[in-house]
Amino acid sequence: MYIPISITTKRYRAGILLLLLLLPLAAQAGGGGTGKQNPVVKGALWVKTLIDSMAVKGIDRSYISQPKRPWAAELRTEASETVLKMHADFPLNSGNQATMTVTTRNGFSTLAGAWVGYRGYGFGLSKNLSGNGGTLSFGAMGGSFGINFRINTYSSSTPDLRLSYSSRDYNFDEHNIEDLDAPISVRSLFLDGYYMFNGKRFSYAAAYDQSLIQRRSAGSLMAGAMYYHSSAKYDDDANYALVAMMKGVGKLKFTQASIGAGYAYNWVPARGWLVNAMLMPMLQFYNSISAYTYRFYSDGFDATDILFTNYDRILEEVLNGLSDGADDSGGADDSGDEVNIELREGGVETTHNYIGFNFDARLAVVYNWSDWYLRVYGHYNRFRYSNDIGYGHTDEWRVYASLGFRF
């Protein structure tokens, strides 16, 4: 499995892994002994003590309890779908309108993986069983806060390509014009954090990582913040036709930041059971898109200006040919020779969008028994963007099922 993660992220992950591996040593070191401690072990012991105290600070023990065993490991399965939809509009010289819509998705995919953590601090890794890509996640949850970090990657060679052509008399749609010779690669980074105003009686961790156990029903107002960054690349030379139809754009990067307030409730219908629901409307105060444009070279000659000078005429002829039922040979000229196009990066245009709204919705069902627990939960997010080149949105939903064991 290949997950393209930056060097900084790799070091961050390695540091978290090292810290988690050192915690058992710190626990052993804290059990006794008067000799001089190794500075690394001493530092890990300090972190362990801090985590232990933060996990239960200020909680009402009649509502929330802490498991005796601090470590937890779980096997996870995940059903998910991420959909990225991009539009590019073309007002033609004839007065007609053309729209290119690219919808790429990882499909209804299933991931399998594992997670390990200590008192609500842990990381997990999942692999897509039906295709490329996977998910790397890290979480930190205390008595009154929760932080989630996730990197997700996938690629698709079979996006839904829709070319729409409108005139005064009719509308013409051509779906799935062709599969791509090179896949569209999508990578997303997701970071969110929450603060619970009723952390004394309500536990977010009890619903989403089981480092605490909710004993009685309780709810809480919440404040939250979210950061989302995603990129889509389809700039391979084999995709030159798609890049041309997207107005020369072969790579997009989206960055969004939101803040919000909402409410969450933990319902305890019977001993060991917990049902959680959370809804948080969010104000999107930062929303930018960077569009990377490309130049088209043929045998070393820059043909970009010639292509786009005659763009309207060429596109109109293609659309009229499709609407008349003409056969599109695609990838060859009239002589039958292959068309060799090389894409070279030209420039980048960054647009800052208007303030908008999105929401974060989550639902979880948990059952605890002895040192075991079973959890099923899901969430949904939508992110929008627009610029002078086009507009679109990203939809993401996930449903997880986890079987965990405390030790």
Predicted regions and their residues:
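Residues on the lipid-exposed face of transmembrane beta-strands in outer-membrane beta-barrel proteins
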Residues: 75, 112-118, 136-142, 191-197, ...
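Outer membrane beta-barrel transmembrane domains
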Residues: 86-100, 112, 120-122, 146, ...
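Extracellular loop and loop/strand-boundary signature of outer-membrane beta-barrel proteins
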Residues: 97-100, 174-182, 208-209, 245-251, ...
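Short sequence motifs at beta-strands and strand-loop junctions characteristic
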Residues: 103-106, 115, 128-130, 183-185, ...
